[in-house]
């Protein structure tokens, strides 16, 4: 299984995809590409991603792409309110009401600007509409006396990406955010992984029977 940005399905990459498909077919695999939206799998983020799965030919009939879940993901305000309020910031309730949509796509951290930010100008405008200052990250939640637009912390971005709060990231703020922003959202990876496991399990059950 491989994951990449949605642009991989553009016509300019047809030859690249076709080459991969031909090579894997020769090796006895059935290749397939699918555009999956993270928000269809409970992730509070606008994050379309292309997923590639290559299944061995004798197992391919047992594989199908995961179906979207029925429930809408929580808004950014619903998802992050407890983290925003962790230091007693009185503006957290009003902020939760403003952050009433899912997040724009998280990026992997900007080396050009010397540190983590939440994306280009258009993305920063989308974050501002949600009550978030997208020009950088904080190490901690806003303090009690804070006035203005708060920034996210790495832990907040990890939750937006679908990581459990117990997940640990290596390094300081910038390094941690780059790991988070470049990651494949775990709920989507898990959904695809379960389908791959199901295809493998069919063969195993058949052998046992």
Task: Pin down the residues of each PLM region.
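C-terminal target-recognition/interaction regions appended to catalytic cores
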Residues: 84-209
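Class I S-adenosyl-L-methionine
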Residues: 1-129, 206
